Structure formats: structure tokens, C-alpha cells
Curated annotation (Swiss-Prot):
Residues 238-503 form the NR LBD domain. Gene3D superfamilies: Erythroid Transcription Factor GATA-1, subunit A, Retinoid X Receptor. This is Peroxisome proliferator-activated receptor gamma. Nuclear receptor that binds peroxisome proliferators such as hypolipidemic drugs and fatty acids. Once activated by a ligand, the nuclear receptor binds to DNA specific PPAR response elements (PPRE) and modulates the transcription of its target genes, such as acyl-CoA oxidase. It therefore controls the peroxisomal beta-oxidation pathway of fatty acids. Key regulator of adipocyte differentiation and glucose homeostasis. ARF6 acts as a key regulator of the tissue-specific adipocyte P2 (aP2) enhancer. Glycans are attached at T84. PDPK1 activates its transcriptional activity independently of its kinase activity. The lineage of its organism: Eukaryota, Metazoa, Chordata, Craniata, Vertebrata. It comes from the Eukaryota. Its main location: nucleus. One of its GO terms (biological process) is cellular response to insulin stimulus. A zinc finger (NR C4-type) spans 139-159, 176-198. The keyword Oxidoreductase does not apply. Heterodimer with other nuclear receptors, such as RXRA. The heterodimer with the retinoic acid receptor RXRA is called adipocyte-specific transcription factor ARF6. Interacts with NCOA6 coactivator, leading to a strong increase in transcription of target genes. Interacts with coactivator PPARBP, leading to a mild increase in transcription of target genes. Interacts with NOCA7 in a ligand-inducible manner. Interacts with NCOA1 and NCOA2 LXXLL motifs. Interacts with ASXL1, ASXL2, DNTTIP2, FAM120B, MAP2K1/MEK1, NR0B2, PDPK1, PRDM16, PRMT2 and TGFB1I1. It comes from Mus musculus (Mouse). Belongs to the nuclear hormone receptor family. NR1 subfamily.
Amino acid sequence: MGETLGDSPVDPEHGAFADALPMSTSQEITMVDTEMPFWPTNFGISSVDLSVMEDHSHSFDIKPFTTVDFSSISAPHYEDIPFTRADPMVADYKYDLKLQEYQSAIKVEPASPPYYSEKTQLYNRPHEEPSNSLMAIECRVCGDKASGFHYGVHACEGCKGFFRRTIRLKLIYDRCDLNCRIHKKSRNKCQYCRFQKCLAVGMSHNAIRFGRMPQAEKEKLLAEISSDIDQLNPESADLRALAKHLYDSYIKSFPLTKAKARAILTGKTTDKSPFVIYDMNSLMMGEDKIKFKHITPLQEQSKEVAIRIFQGCQFRSVEAVQEITEYAKNIPGFINLDLNDQVTLLKYGVHEIIYTMLASLMNKDGVLISEGQGFMTREFLKNLRKPFGDFMEPKFEFAVKFNALELDDSDLAIFIAVIILSGDRPGLLNVKPIEDIQDNLLQALELQLKLNHPESSQLFAKVLQKMTDLRQIVTEHVQLLHVIKKTETDMSLHPLLQEIYKDLY
């Protein structure tokens, strides 16, 4: 007979996985025995484009697991945000020359351009988007749409060229004392006042800057835009409050942020560099040098390396499921959904989120392990015997493309919430409230990306496309697990993962 939470019947088929979800404090939580031999090097959860460091993710590391104990869910201290439709907005021990080669690989190189097909774009919403005009950065001189950061300010092509010609040719204009108003249509009428306006807003030949906009300038600009948006569209303030709440919850739920992982991978940290594992010898050295949270039992040292690594990944995945579940509780409206639907949403969403966040720990050459203490090379993982050598390659391919989008933790916090609240998961009982929550999250994500990446007009569509890619990766992962189940008869999956994978794709 199924357990109940209030009036919500709990499908007994969900078993232990349902124990990760809301239950009254008086109810006992079923404990899942996770006692299983494993090797303590695990993979984590995140995403990496290491040339530009941003915010949040996981690491592959093993903690002692005897039980999976999910605490009861209580309503988060959060002021409800209405779900009505709003108008948008990765050593020091040098074994040989080959190690030095891999050490240099830790620095992330520019990722290849992301694949995107407009034909597969998700969530095309037929509502008006006045946000486009609100987000257009205006020329500080005439108010036309700015083409970039020119001579120290944001300016359009016309005013940039006008200022350049004036300075280069040392032009002197007839004085005008009328203080003419300079705007898009009148900017060519009074050259004197136009040049004075250029100087007044801060244009200077000495202010030419190359490369990306300085962070301080970017923050100032975003603050100005945000203020204007909130005044013109008060509902956007609710979306930004939602984004901040999700970011705060994300930071509390996940131990290794994308920003920290990128700092490790790019060497921009005061901590020592991660220990590089690229072959069997370095693997054995790593087991001595890296401070794993769980000591591998001596009797397990004889197990084949591929199996030990695979089992280690399993236990990290279990830990990740717990972290994701805690995060999901803090998504406004999630704990009010039917309990069976909460289980279903997590069952289908956790691995998509794991691979999203795993990307933060990756570059094209390898992945951070054990909370950034180690770096296991892509080639080493790829050369493990089949089918184990096939598991990580699709994740690396996805990470390279996903990292090219340069999302930071504040972006990822909303993106993974959108993944969780997917109303098209099989077996959902009440789709409407799920879609309502996701629709609000999508609007918050769109606004967040426009504010945080004003130069990337198509980023929202590209990010949503990655949701389709993630589903394909999970499908392929499950298919490989079926192969292992048939070929590795002496090895079993973790009970919680068995439950998640059951009937999954």
C-alpha cells in the first residue's frame, strides 16, 4: 500500500527515490543501503570554458556512503513570486616530460563554436517581447543603437566615425551657443554641439580599449539597464528576484561552483595545482597524494581500474542526486506539486543536470576530480577497456560546445531549474502547474541572459537547444548501462541509481 503525504498518494513503485522528497517530520525516511566497494576517485558536476571564469558546479569526489539520508522538505523562506505570465527579461610532482605536457593542458583553450539549429528550438512563445527594445544599448551621444564600446563609451557607428574623423583630421567646428539637442535624427545638423556631446559623455582618443568590456563598466551598464527595465516593466523585478533566489539556493546546494572550477583549471587560484592522472602510474601516485574523502578498502585495490573508476562515478552520482534534490526543494512551487510528479521530475531531470554541471569541471583535455585536487585526462578515460571507455567521451563533446556559451553560475541556477520543471516528462499526473512554474522560469532565464549577456542576442535560444542535446546524452548513457549489465555480471549498480534508471528511456 502506497504511503501518503497529506492527500497525495505515493506510488510504491518509486520506492527509495521517493524518500528524497517532501515528507512530514513525523514520518520515517526509508534508508537506502549503499554499502558497496568502490574506488574513491569520482567525477563531479559542472561546465567549463576556462578562458573566461564565471560561477558554479560540482566535483568528482567520494564521500563515505552508508546510507542516503534525505532530510524532510520544508517550505523555503522565500516570498512567493507569482507564476503569472510576465513580459520578459578545474603536479607539483613531476614524474616525466609527458606529465608536463598534460599540465599545460589544464589551461582551457577556446572551445569550438556551439552547434545550433533553429529548427530544433524549444519553447517558442508567441507573446510580444518589448524586452528587445529595452535591452538595446543606446549610443551615449545620440541615443541610436550602440554598435559597441568605442573611445571609452558605448556609441553607434555614426558617432564613432564622427568622433574619429574629428580627432584624426583635427577639425574645428563653428562655435554654437544654442546647446543643440543631439539625437538620432538631428545629430548631423550641428557638428559643434555633437562634438561637445561626445566629449561630455566621456569619449576620448586615449580611452580606446581592446578586447572585452571591463567588468566594472559592464556592471555599471547592467545596473543602469536593470533600473530602466524595472521602471518600465515592474513585473521584471519579480523575475530578477526569482533569479537571485535561485542563485542563492544554488550556491548553498552545490559545493564546487563553476567559478571555482575555472579558477583551478586556469591556474587563477592560490591553491596548489591539481594532481594530473594520465596513466596507471600516475593513477597509483594520485591515490597516495590526493586526499580522498573515502579510503578505498585494501581488498578493493585488486579490482580492475575501469571498474573502480566506474563505481566511484556511481557514488558521486548518488551524492549529486542528493544535492540536486535539495536544490529542487527551493524552486518556488516545486514542493506544492503532487509528490509523485516531484519524483518523476527528479527521476528524469537529475542526470541532465549532472552532465550540465559536469561540463564546468571539464576542458577539452580532461576533467577535475576530488573537488579539484586531481585532473584526470580525457585520453586516459577514453583508453579504459570497453564499454567503460565509451562513457565519458559524449560528455566531453557536449562540454566543449556548452562551455562556448560562457554561462556563469547565476545563469546555470535558472537553467537547471528549467530542466527540472519540464512538463513533458512521461508519467506526470498534473502537467498544468508544472508548465506554469517552468514558464515563469523561462521568462526569468530569458531576462537573466539578456542582462548578463547583452551582446549575445540568440543566447536564450541556444541554451534551450542544449536541453535536447542533454536528453540524447542521457539516452546514450542508459544504453551503455544496459550493455554493462549484460557483460559485467559480477558488478551491480547502486540501488538508488537502479531506481532512477528503471524504465528511463
